[in-house]
Regions:
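Glycine-rich FAD pyrophosphate-binding loop
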Residues: 7-31
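Short glycine-rich, polar/acidic loop-and-turn segments at beta strand-coil junctions
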Residues: 17-20, 40, 75-76, 116
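Short, hinge-like loop/turn segments at secondary-structure boundaries
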Residues: 30-35, 98-99
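Glycine-rich active-site loop/strand segments that organize a redox cofactor
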Residues: 33-81
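Feature captures the FAD/FMN-dependent oxidoreductase FAD-binding
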Residues: 61-116
Length: 116
């Protein structure tokens, strides 16, 4: 996400990836349906972080679960709230989200260097 924010300001960005492909862990996380976030209130959401909640509050409030959903929508990846309150992409897959994100990054001029 940092690469996207910086590149959107016109700053050249190069992402160095240790693996041979982009988003390997992201794709693995998506194998179970890609639970992106939760739809509960901010206070309840923060309570999940235990003792670290107050330290993390400014960062999470700066990019909230609703902001994450809007970001996905901006990539053309609609989300929905499941019966558990968890938020998922409508596709239930990580790969469409990753492809859309990579396309956005490349359109912003972000370069990728992968481990050979």
């Amino acid at each position: 996400m940092a690469a996207e924010v910086i590149a959107s300001k016109g700053v050249p960005v190069t992402v160095y990836e240790r693996k041979a492909t982009l988003g390997r862990k992201f794709l693995l996380a998506g194998r179970g349906g890609l639970n992106l976030t939760h739809s509960e209130s901010m206070d309840r959401f923060l309570a999940r972080y235990g003792a670290a909640a107050e330290r993390l509050r400014p960062a999470i409030e700066n990019f909230s679960p609703n902001d994450l959903r809007a970001w996905c929508e901006g990539l053309g990846q609609a989300t929905f709230v499941g019966s558990s309150g968890r938020v998922f992409p409508e596709s239930f897959k990580a790969s469409p989200l990753l492809r859309a994100w990579r396309a956005r990054l490349e359109n912003l001029g972000v370069k990728f260097i992968f481990q050979k």
